[in-house]
Regions:
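Beta-rich accessory regions
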Residues: 133-309
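Catalytic core of carbohydrate-active enzymes
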Residues: 1-207, 213-214
Length: 309
């Protein structure tokens, strides 16, 4: 039918990839009494945090469930409130910049295969890349990095109570994002040949340098939409990955616009006309004015307006 079976399969696979994140969250519940799932008002003292009852925190990620049917244009509308800050949808990579102190209310559009799950700037999200249903500590880890300042400690343990902690410290300054990695604990419980795929989710055209124990080393650059490098993990040695974005914030905004316009179902001539108008915009304000005044369908305009959320 509509592909819901395949979508469910993908989310079940993603849940398995989340095990490092979920296991660490369970450890925090045990050690610090911090729940995995929390209402927004646990973290944000705002009237909106109480009014938007469907939204919740999932290990620090903001989740906005889809509670209404999709419309004929293929999108569901989700009314959301976001606190002040910068957020990235972990599935669609859409970015949202909230500058007002009291946060901002708005509407997000999503197709059947996705729901809004937003990582705040500074988030570090560990995922397993191992295949199969093994519950062993993963040999291959993917570390998703969302530009900003933050800290995350990955927790792993063994069958006899051994523990291992990997500190992941993220800083952003002077146009570069730096991820520091250092592990401590019983190294016998982690795989000897562990590799880390590090994905800088907000850098689309960038360069990276990797330092191991203060010495620069070669790293394997992988060709994904965003800047991605692979490094071999070494216990007891600090790893630093320094990433630089070669594009400005407005250039990244234009990149998102191009992606939305490519996917939009519009009359080809109208679509081409406004696409050419948009790419000539000199700044974000002008781009927003052009979108509002365009002849595009309301669903396309609403999707484009998410760029300025």
């Amino acid at each position: 039918g509509n592909g819901t079976g395949l979508i469910a399969e993908e989310f079940l696979r993603f849940r398995h990839r989340l095990i490092p994140f979920l296991y660490t969250a369970n450890y925090l519940t045990h050690a610090q009494g911090k729940p995995l799932v929390e209402p927004l008002y646990y973290e944000y003292a705002s009237e909106e945090a109480y009014r938007y009852r469907d939204e919740y925190l999932f290990g620090g990620l903001i989740v906005a469930p889809v509670t209404s049917p999709i419309k004929e244009d293929g999108y569901a509308r989700i009314n959301v409130w976001l606190p002040k800050g910068k957020y990235t949808d972990i599935f669609t990579k859409e970015e949202y910049f909230i500058e007002t102190a009291g946060g901002k209310e708005g509407v997000l559009l999503r197709k059947l295969e996705s729901i809004p799950v937003l990582a705040k700037a500074g988030t570090v999200l560990p995922l397993s890349l191992d295949n199969g249903n093994s519950v062993k500590n993963p040999e291959k880890l993917e570390i998703k990095v969302y530009s900003g300042n933050g800290r995350y400690t990955l927790y792993e343990d063994g069958e006899n109570g051994e523990e291992y902690f990997t500190d992941l410290v993220l800083t952003e300054s002077g146009g570069q994002v730096v991820l520091g990695i250092f592990g401590h604990g019983d190294a016998g419980i982690i795989p000897r040949n562990r590799t880390l795929r590090i994905c800088f989710e907000n850098i689309y055209d960038g360069v990276a340098e990797v330092y191991c124990g203060g010495k620069r080393i070669d790293c394997g650059k992988e060709y994904f939409v965003n800047l991605t490098v692979t490094v071999n993990y070494e216990h007891g040695t600090e790893i630093r990955v320094v990433a630089k974005d070669r594009k400005t914030a407005f250039e990244n905004m234009l990149y998102r616009m191009k992606k939305i316009m490519t996917e939009a179902e519009e009359d080809v001539f109208i679509k081409d006309k406004w696409y050419n108008e948009f790419i000539r915009a000199e700044n974000a304000c002008k781009l927003e004015e052009l979108i509002v005044s365009s002849e595009l369908k309301e669903v396309t305009k609403t999707k484009l307006k998410e760029i300025f959320f």
